[in-house]
Amino acid sequence: MKQHEAILDIQLKELKLSTFKSNWNDAEQFAISKNYSYSQYLSYLCGIEIDKRIGTRLIRMIKESKLPKNKTLSSYDFDSCKSINKDQISALAETDTWVNQAHNLIIFGASGLGKTHIASAIAYRKIELGMRVKFFQTSHLVQILQVAKQQFRLKEEIIKLDRIPLIILDDIGYVKKDEHETSVLFELICHRYETSSIIITSNQP
């Protein structure tokens, strides 16, 4: 390796441009073969860096979301359930207006309808568009909130979710109807009312 190349590697490492560091040489050869100008070469290399960062961020956001795997709109069988409006679901997935306005979405119906699939698919698309989401089995979240309440940190636990514009409460109908469980859930929903969005799925209307 030539001295200036070694220095460049050190500089790129210092700038935390790891994809630049790994690809500048191959990108240079490609740019030469295409007769790119210096600015075109730099733009091409920046594109590689950006694509890598977007991919890395997407992987991190999907992992953080705890969404069920392989639940996308393309994998949902709309033909098997004529009561589900594909265009309407697609519009909810593609547009951010309802989330920006802190509207909520309730998906209810009989078992086997694919409510969790639809909710997860909408949320997955939101992640692809750069939005943070979080999926919860409602009964599990209630347990977390109950423990937090016993430890006098319920408000703190609820506020932690403020950084997530969209959360999914799956199978809310399975939450026991006793006061302890419903009260913490009520506090969460009230806290997010008109500030952040929730998708709720349930077997009961």
Where are the regions that the model predicts?
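Charged, compositionally biased N-terminal leader segments and the immediate start
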Residues: 1-21
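Interdomain "pre-motor" coupling segment immediately N-terminal to P-loop NTPase/helicase cores
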Residues: 17-69
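N-terminal pre-Walker A segment at the start of P-loop NTPase domains
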Residues: 73-96
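Conserved hydrophobic/aromatic pocket- or pore-lining residues that grip, position, or stack substrates
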Residues: 76, 119, 137
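Walker A/P-loop
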Residues: 97, 107-131
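Walker A (P-loop) ATP-phosphate-binding motif of ABC ATPase nucleotide-binding domains
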Residues: 104
